[in-house]
């Protein structure tokens, strides 16, 4: 994962998803952000494509103050169980480092 920038309440970072069975082209997936015991599901319209890269744009105010770290999960279809998804951790974003680096 390669962080791009953090300015104010807008967080944008490149997501490299290599979770087995996960495809950005599939409609059958969800991405979940967890921070400060809060959870937000990311919808397909929150994913911005730039060539072959995919960026995730997030309004971080929904997590409240004092954020330290955000974990990004992908839910991928489980081929062994119908209507079941496997949660796979795909990224950990250190929000303090982003703020320090980009002055948010």
Predicted segments, located by residue:
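Contiguous segments within soluble domain cores/interaction surfaces
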Residues: 1-104
